[in-house]
């Protein structure tokens, strides 16, 4: 199973736009507000060396519920606009 986690922040227009695009594409995702999941996001930002949002954590989970493959996608590092970000997610979910 593959899971999509989207890091967002209240009041972020790009976060709202990317959520709308994911929903239009019928992509299920788990939203994590960085104010509520600060430690988790700080670790993500440290690994990606990027603190911009919206950002993605894409996880493949095996039959024992263990993370088998983790991909991190951060804006400006891995994608330049929300549409490119959504395309990365679509490609991952194929």
Task: Give the predicted meaning of each segment.
Residues 15, 38, 83:
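Loop/helix-junction capping segments adjacent to catalytic residues or to phosphate/diphosphate-binding pockets
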Residues 11, 34-37, 78:
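Short beta->alpha junction loops/turns
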Residues 1-30:
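Local sequence-structure signature of Cys/Sec-based thiol-disulfide redox active-site neighborhoods
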Residues 33-52, 60-62, 86-93:
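Thioredoxin-like thiol-disulfide oxidoreductase module
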Residues 58-94:
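Non-catalytic, surface beta->alpha helical segment in thiol-disulfide oxidoreductase systems
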């Amino acid at each position: 199973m593959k899971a999509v986690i989207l890091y967002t922040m209240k009041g972020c227009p790009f976060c709202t736009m990317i959520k709308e695009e994911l929903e239009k594409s019928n992509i299920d995702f788990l939203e994590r507000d960085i104010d509520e999941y600060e430690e988790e996001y700080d670790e993500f930002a440290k690994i990606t060396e990027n603190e911009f949002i919206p950002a993605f954590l894409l996880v493949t989970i095996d039959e024992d519920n263990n993370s088998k493959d983790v991909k991190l996608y951060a804006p400006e590092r891995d994608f330049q606009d929300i549409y490119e970000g959504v395309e990365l997610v679509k490609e991952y979910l194929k």
